[in-house]
């Protein structure tokens, strides 16, 4: 999977197809807040996403409070968003349903 930083237009195009994701202000990253019915469901989402992140060797920044999971994705080695981040975002959306 390519780790080349996406151009602004590539990132904008990818975000149009990613429900709920947006650019982070003041940083080259994307973010989304997921809300679930309860803590167990939120934690289950994180467990599934973590297993996928390990396969991809690309790990999210995230924060969990009860039924909410806030996620930020960026490829630190490229100082920006790459196809790996887009792939991870797609998978997280699929897991969340």
UniProtKB/Swiss-Prot annotation:
Keywords attached to this entry: Lyase
EC number: 4.2.1.96
Protein name: Putative pterin-4-alpha-carbinolamine dehydratase
Source species, domain of life: Bacteria
Family matches, as InterPro entries: PCD_sf, Pterin_deHydtase
Catalyzed reaction equations: (4aS,6R)-4a-hydroxy-L-erythro-5,6,7,8-tetrahydrobiopterin = (6R)-L-erythro-6,7-dihydrobiopterin + H2O
Keyword Transmembrane helix applies: no
Gene from which the chain derives: phhB
SUPFAM superfamilies to which the protein is assigned, alphabetical: PCD-like
Organism phylogeny: Bacteria, Pseudomonadati, Pseudomonadota, Alphaproteobacteria, Hyphomicrobiales
Family of the protein in this entry: Belongs to the pterin-4-alpha-carbinolamine dehydratase family.
GO MF terms held by the record: 4-alpha-hydroxytetrahydrobiopterin dehydratase activity
Keyword Acetylation: no
HAMAP family the UniProt entry points to: Pterin_4_alpha
């Amino acid at each position: 999977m390519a780790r080349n930083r996406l151009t602004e237009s590539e990132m904008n195009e990818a975000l149009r197809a990613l429900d709920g994701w947006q650019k982070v202000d003041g940083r080259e990253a994307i973010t989304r807040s997921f809300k679930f019915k309860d803590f167990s469901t939120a934690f289950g989402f994180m467990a599934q996403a973590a297993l996928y992140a390990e396969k991809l060797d690309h790990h999210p920044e995230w924060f969990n409070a009860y039924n909410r999971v806030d996620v930020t994705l960026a490829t630190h080695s490229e100082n920006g968003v790459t196809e790996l981040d887009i792939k991870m975002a797609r998978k997280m959306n699929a897991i969340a349903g």
